[in-house]
Amino acid sequence: MDSGGGGGGGALRPSALDLVAALLTGRGRPEEEGWPPSLAENRHLIVLLTTSLAVLVGCGVALLVRRSSISAPAVRAQEPQPRAPAPAKRKQEAEPDPDDGRQRVAVFFGTQTGTAEGFAKALAEEAKSRYDKAVFKVLDLDEYAADDEEYEQKLKKEIIALFFVATYGDGEPTDNAARFYKWFGEGNERGEWLSNLRFGVFGLGNRQYEHFNKVGKVVDQLLAEQGGKRIVPLGLGDDDQCIEDDFNAWKELLWPELDKLLRVEDDKSAAPTPYTAAIPEYRVVLVKPEEAMHINKSFSLSNGHAVYDIQHPCRANVAVRRELHTPASYRSCIHLEFDISGTGLTYETGDHVGVYAENCTETVEEVENLLGYSPDTLFSIHADQEDGTPLFGGSLPPPFPSPCTVGTALARYADLLSFPKKSALIALASHASDPKDAERLRHLASPAGKKEYSQWIVSSQRSLLEVMTEFPSAKPPLGVFFAAIAPRLQPRYYSISSSPRMTPTRIHVTCALVYGQTPTGRIHKGVCSTWMKNSIPLEESQECSWAPIFVRQSNFKLPTDPTVPIIMIGPGTGLAPFRGFLQERLALKETGVELGHAVLFFGCRNRKMDFIYEDELNNFVETGALSELIVAFSREGPSKEYVQHKMAEKAPEIWSIISQGGYIYVCGDAKGMARDVHRTLHTIVQEQGSLDNSNTESYVKSLQMEGRYLRDVW
C-alpha cells in the first residue's frame, strides 16, 4: 500500500508570485521554504518594494473602475469568479427553483451506499422525458432543511413528493435520513397538516433481516397519517434478490398516477414517448506523465476538514495487527489497532468505525487486463463538460479525486466483487465487440431474462469481475466503467472494540476474515478483512499500512448510571463492542466508581481454537469489571450449544436483572443469532413474568422504546 507523502524529485524553484504571496502572508521562514539565500537575506527590502508596487497597482485599478462606472452607469460590473471551492451551502440554497410555472415534484432520498440516490436520479431523468410541464427536483433529506422548523415549513408547501428511503442496520434510517426520520416520527401533534400532498414511497431493504424495509414502511404510514394522499402503493425493494426489478415494477405503477396529475387534457390521450435510459459516462482526460509530475500521491480525501466523516475520512496508520485464533483453527480473526494520535479524530465507547480498504492486487490486475489499460495510465475524471455544464443534468455523483492512475482507481474506488446490476450489463453490452456477447448481456438485463439473471448472477454470486471474464469482448471506456458499471467501493463498518478511557489514541477493530467458496467455485475474499489480514503494522515497519477511516456515532451505549445492571450477548466478533464496554467499566472502577452487575454471554466453536480475548475476559472477571462470564462452545460437546441455550439456562437471573431496570445488549449476526436471541428473550419474559403472548410483545417492545434493549447487528 502507498505510504503516502508527496511525489519525489528535486526541490521546485519558487515563482515570483509564490515569493510575493509568501511574503505578504508571512508563510514560513524563507530559509525553510526553499528560498535562494540572496532573496532570504533581503526579505524585508522585498516586502517594502512589493507592498509599494501593490499599492500603486491598486490605485490604478481603482481609477479605471471609477471611470468605467461613470461612463456606463447602466451596466453592473461582474467580477470573474475564481475556480475555487465555494463556501459550504445546502444544495437547495445554491440552486433556486426556476419560476417558470411548471409543476414541481420533489424526489427525496435517504441513502447509505448510493442505491437510493441512484434510483431517485434515474426516476427523475426518465420523468423529465415524460412530463415537459413539470420539474423534478432530486433532494437529499438531510440537506433539505437546516432544522425541524424548516422541515415543516418546506414540506407543507410540497404538492407531489416521492421518497426513496433505505433501511440500515437494525431497522434504522440512513445517516442522511436520520434527522428527518426522527423529526417526522414525532409529528403526531401536528395532525393532518399534509392534506395538499400527494406522495409515493419506495423502500430499500433486505428481506433476510428482521426489520425488512422498516424505514420505508414507517415513512409511508406517517405520511398518510399526517394527511398525505398516497398515489402509489409502498414499494418494497429487496436487495437479497434483484432490487432493480422491484424498482422498475414500482415505476410502472407510478407512471399512470403521475399522468393524471402532470399531463394536461390534450396530452392524456397521447402515449408517452418510449424511454431508453442513456448510459452515463464521466468525461475522462488522459494525463501525460510529465504533466502530472507534481500530483500529490497521498490519499486525497483526507483533505484537512475539521470534522471527519464518510466524505472526509482521516488517514490512520495500522499500529498493531495480530491473529486472535490459535494455529489449530482453519479460520482467522484479526485484532487491528488504528493510530489516531495527532489527527483530532475522537470516538466514544460503542461507536462504529468506517474503513476504506483496497481491492487486493490480483483482483485489480485481472480487471486492468480485461479493460485493456496499463495500471500506470494517468487520467482525470469529471462530472461536467469542459465549459462546466453538468453531464446528464447533474445526475452523476461526484467522481473520485483525480488525476490518478488506473491501478489506483480500481484499487480504491471500484467495487469489483459484488454482483453487477442489470444497468451495468446493458452498459457492458453497448461496448462489446462480439455480437454474441452483446446479445447475451442484453438478454440477462431484459424482462425475458429475469429468471436467468436471478440464477446465473444472484444465486451463483457472480461478481462483476467474473461477468467481465465471461464476456471478454466488452471493453468499456473508463468514463463508462466508473459511471455505469462498477459502483463506488463503500466503506466497511466495524463495532469499535476499545474504550477511549483506556486507549484514547487508538481505535481497536475485531474482524473475522471473510474467505469461502462461492457456488461457481470461485474463492471469495472479503475486501476489507483480506486487507486487514495482510496489513503491515507500525510495530513491524515504518512503511506500515494505512487506511482512510471515520467514526460513525451509535446509540449502543452503556447506561449513564454505572450502577445499572447490564446483560451483554455477543458470540464471535459480536464481542467487539463489549470489550470496549468492559474496558470502560474497568477504567471507571479504577477511579473508585461503583459498578452494577454485568453478565456476558459469549459464544465460539472451540476453546482451543477461537476463544478470542480469553485472557482479557478472565482479567475483567478478576478485577470486577465483569460479574459473570458465560461461554457457549458450539463444536466441543456431542451437541451444538449457542448463546441462546445459555440464556435459557439463566432465565431467572436474566428476568431478575430486567426487573431491576437492567439493560440488554445484543451484537452480531442479524439473520441468525439475533433472531434466535430475540425469540429466547421473548420466551424468558413470557415464562418468568407470567405474561400472555400479547403482553409479552408489548413488554419487549417497551424495553426497546425505553432504550433498554439495544442491538448492534449486521
UniProtKB/Swiss-Prot annotation:
Domain named Flavodoxin-like: residues: 105-255
Lumenal compartment residues: 1-44
PROSITE patterns noted in UniProt: FAD_FR (PS51384), FLAVODOXIN_LIKE (PS50902)
Cofactor(s) this protein requires: FAD; FMN
CDD domains: CYPOR (cd06204)
UniProt membrane topology term: Single-pass membrane protein
Gene3D superfamilies, alphabetized: 3.40.50.360, NADPH-cytochrome p450 Reductase, Chain A, domain 3, Nucleotide-binding domain of ferredoxin-NADP reductase (FNR) module, Translation factors
EC number in record: 1.6.2.4
Cofactor note: Binds 1 FAD per monomer. Binds 1 FMN per monomer.
Catalytic reactions of this protein: 2 oxidized [cytochrome P450] + NADPH = 2 reduced [cytochrome P450] + NADP(+) + H(+)
Positions contributing to FMN binding: 111-116, 166-169, 204-213, 239
Keywords carried by this UniProt record: Endoplasmic reticulum, FAD, Flavoprotein, FMN, Membrane, NADP, Oxidoreductase, Transmembrane, Transmembrane helix
Positions bound to NADP(+): 331, 573, 634-635, 640-644, 676
Pfam families per the UniProt record, alphabetical: FAD_binding_1 (PF00667), Flavodoxin_1 (PF00258), NAD_binding_1 (PF00175)
Any one cellular-component term (Gene Ontology): endoplasmic reticulum membrane
Molecular function (Gene Ontology), one example: NADPH-hemoprotein reductase activity
Parts of the chain on the Cytoplasmic side: 66-714
Subcellular location: Endoplasmic reticulum membrane
Transmembrane segments: 45-65
Record function comment: This enzyme is required for electron transfer from NADP to cytochrome P450 in microsomes. It can also provide electron transfer to heme oxygenase and cytochrome B5.
Record-stated family: Belongs to the NADPH--cytochrome P450 reductase family. In the C-terminal section; belongs to the flavoprotein pyridine nucleotide cytochrome reductase family.
Name of the protein described by the UniProt record: NADPH--cytochrome P450 reductase 3
Organism lineage: Eukaryota, Viridiplantae, Streptophyta, Embryophyta, Tracheophyta
